[in-house]
Regions:
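Conserved catalytic submotifs in the C-terminal HATPase_c
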Residues: 20-25, 45-55
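Acidic ATP/Mg2+-coordinating residue in the GHKL
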Residues: 101
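Short conserved segment of the HATPase_c
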Residues: 106-118
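Short alpha-helical Gxxx[C/S/T] motif in the catalytic ATP-binding
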Residues: 135, 139
Length: 172
């Protein structure tokens, strides 16, 4: 939870987190990550759409943590019955993974703050506090350490789309 995220961010930011980079197939990493989704998600339809044989360079433990975090957020902040789609593609010379949901989305005024460490915003789902900060700050730091980007865009017609990139493997 929160303590693990905070410890990970601290280790990441001061260079104590050791990375073990290996070449991994996107579809396998996505499938394995879904086995770690903690909450019961029978009420949610989780769909994967992944290009075959996309090999990316990553620390697989950390990238799985990013994926689990993004999918958990999508489950937590969308009503039961929502569809969550995880896509893996090769785009512009990079591996790209996106987690899309068709929930209420994130209000415009919150978007510029969601990667801040302790930011919490209000959402419409039972008007609960959306404590995005720590998890998303950690995800952002992990992806940056992989020389990638993590961005939030709106998912048409409503919902969120978190997309991150990773370097492709340099396999001949």
């Amino acid at each position: 939870g929160v303590v693990e995220n905070l410890l990970s961010i601290t280790r990441l930011n001061d260079g104590r987190l050791k990375f073990k980079f290996t070449d991994q197939l996107l579809d396998e990493v996505i499938a394995e990550s879904l086995r770690h989704i903690s909450r019961k998600h029978d009420d949610y339809k989780i769909v994967t759409d992944c290009e075959e044989l996309v090999l990316a360079r990553m620390d697989v433990r950390l990238i799985m943590q990013v994926l689990v975090n993004l999918v958990d957020n999508a489950i937590k902040y969308t009503p039961p019955g929502s569809v969550i789609c995880i896509r893996g593609t090769k785009t512009d010379g990079k591996a790209q993974i996106s987690v899309e949901d068709n929930g209420p989305g994130i209000p415009e005024e919150m978007k510029s703050h969601i990667f801040e460490m302790f930011y919490t915003g209000k959402t419409t789902v039972a008007d609960s506090q959306r404590s995005l900060g720590l998890g998303l700050a950690l995800c952002h730091s992990i992806i940056e350490a992989h020389e990638g980007t993590l961005v939030l865009t709106d998912h048409d017609p409503h919902g969120c789309n978190f997309t991150f990139t990773l370097p492709l493997s340099e396999v001949t």
